[in-house]
Amino acid sequence: MLAGSFAVTELAHAQVRPTRPRPRPDDVPAQSRNTTGSAQTGNVKNTRSTGTDSLRHRTGLEDSITITFRYLDSSALQRFDSSVHDFTSRFPVPAHYVYLGNVGAAARNIIFTPLLRSGWDAGFHAFDVYRFTLNETRFYNTTRPYSELGYLLGSKAEQMIHVLHTQNIRPNWNAALQYRLINSPGYFQNQNTNHNSYRFNSYYQSRNKRYSNFFIIVANKLAASENGGIRTDLPYLDSSSFQERSGIPVKLGTRPGNNNFRDFFSNNIHTGNKYSDFYLVLRQQYDLGQKDSIIVNDTTVIPLFYPRLRFEHTFRLSNQTYRFEDSYPDSSLPLYQLYGIDTAHPFYMQDKWKEIMNDFSIYTFPDRKNPQQFLKLGAALQNLSGSFDSSKSAGPRPKTLYNFLVHGEYRNRTRNKKWEIEAFGNFYVAGNYAADYDAYISLKRLISPTIGFLQAGFRNINRTPSFVFDVNSGFWKERATQSFNKENISMIFGSLEQPRLRMRLSGNYYLISNYAYFNNINQRAQESGVFNLLQLTLEKQFTIHKNWQWRSMVVLQQTAGPAPVNVPLIFTRNQVGYEGNLGFRNLRTAFGMELRYHTPYKADAYSPFMGQFYFQDTTRINNTPDIGLYLHFRIKTFMAFVRAENLNTYRFAGSNTGFTNNNLAAPDYPMPGLQIRVGIFWSFVN
């Protein structure tokens, strides 16, 4: 029986939000770490009879659940986040991202983050925040079947559905299924989005703890209409005649027959980008080691197993399709002329990829009493087949690629938990991406309870530019051929965390050469010079009075040298509000005001045809601070979010009074006015 009100042992008391896994090179599980966080505990052997008694006293915990999860590249067990102050924990777009006016549209990070990935990459990342990924797959362990349903409704029929179910089929075998739908017609013409994502994963471990099996299926189907931004021949945003923003003319998708849709489950995109991907991963491990046991009493023995040598094989199969299409092109529009489209027939560009990868690795655990110290060595063979096509080509152009790489990793978290060392690297020995590499090292130390944790590290990546920069890509429309050298990215990073002060100070210093980028709607370029960029981030939580809190994040960014990168000097996000229970034992609530702001800068423009943000140095974005009010609360397993966003867009004077003073996400791409969102998430246990 589903229980709407139950005590979730771990869910109700966990306060610390689990951090998302750090992106690994290639997002390839074969190259990611898989540590053993503790000695493997076997099933408890108990010879005593445990018969049931229908008349026994109920404790109130019969409907409780203990649930933990881990990621593929780590054995550290984590618990659900029960805090309610951060809406982005349930919303796909992080707070430090901007999206093009409609949830589901292309999005980018305001905080500069280069692509830290060696080897092959297709090159289409504008919709990455909406994808389910391999790295974020959670492998659960639960004492009872657990389900979670979520529904979010926003202005202009914005909707999001979230479904999660996990259960242990056996004590040593768990399976989980997750689905998410994002659908939004948008505020402006030809802006609708429809994204479907699902994930199935399973984790099995033999009773003797020697064999482990990880299985993942992830698929995404993303569809987003593209309008090219609003037209600028008239001041439409300031005109009282266009207070209804859907009446403002746009640059793409305006030909008769290309009508907007508001069908909830429709995926009918006439002019826009359609991306899809499918991943299947099977990882198998077999351990050799030492047995042990703990004798609890005369009748109970807990068997233990300490791995000393591990053999691992990871198989990955993936299919990826990236397509722009326009069923009703209009060659008279300036944007088409700029891109060189002169046809009245349906137009499309497409890259399709199929990947098969096999990885073999060996782990050794030097210290029996410290399973979090290990050395990993391995090699992988990657086979790629691509097909590139457009409406102007004679037909699909096939291409096959292969890569052979070696990789290694060392990790050591000392038993006193004062030191944590991590180092990994991969090197492409042969193939189409030979000489690509990625090297990383990080040291973390607990200085003292007063000072906190200090981390310092270095990373260097030598990578071939993404395949969208290759002349063979179906998205290559430039008349002249061009070759690109390997990019080199060096990164020095560090952080200081002080839990007592609820503060974290971090910094990144980038040194980049041969940076490949887009500098126009359909033009690629490479900066041969060397430039650097410095980032400093301060995160701090202040107590104003009792339960009144102020959470603040401030990011400072500065470039030097010939940098084809524009970033705001300062970005900040602040929350000021109440966090507590208002005297009710089962209530947890947070309400107050949220503010986001960045200093004026020349933000990247967007190419709808390429699905890429590109560098521009002519238009300066000067936005007012984003202001919103929020009321979030949790009652046992029911969670709700009520939000009023973009209050800063209210215009007090003139004939265009109302929420019409829109901010810009990119040149010619305005954000919405007032936006109301209501989301509910409910957990159930069987």
Regions picked out by a protein language model, each given a short descriptive name:
Residues 8-14:
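Sec/Tat signal peptide C-region and signal peptidase I cleavage site
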Residues 1-2, 12:
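Cleavable N-terminal signal peptides
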